C-alpha cells in the first residue's frame, strides 16, 4: 500500500507492504509512525491516517478522538493476514 508523506501510520504490528510516495518500501517505523499505545496528536498538516491491524477498541478510540478534535482527514484501515489455504480442495467434477 502506498502511504502519502502527510500521513500518520498507527500500527499494532508493523506491516511488510508499505511504500512511500516515491515507491520505496518502508521497512521500519519512522517519525510519523506510532503504536496504538503511544500518544500522538493530529493537526491540519496530517491529511490521512493509516491504521494497521487495529482492534475494534482501537478503531473506536481513533474515531472518538477524530470527532472530538474535529479533524477532517481520511482514515484508511489495513488488515494483514496470513493466506492459509482451506483444509480441502475445491474440485470441479463433471
Swiss-Prot record:
The keyword S-adenosyl-L-methionine does not apply. Its main location: host cell. GO terms for cellular component: host cell cytoplasm; virion component. It is found in: Host cytoplasm; Virion. Pfam families: Chordopox_A15. Late protein which is a part of a large complex required for early virion morphogenesis. This complex participates in the formation of virosomes and the incorporation of virosomal contents into nascent immature virions. Required for the stability and kinase activity of OPG054. Belongs to the orthopoxvirus OPG142 family. This is Core protein OPG142.
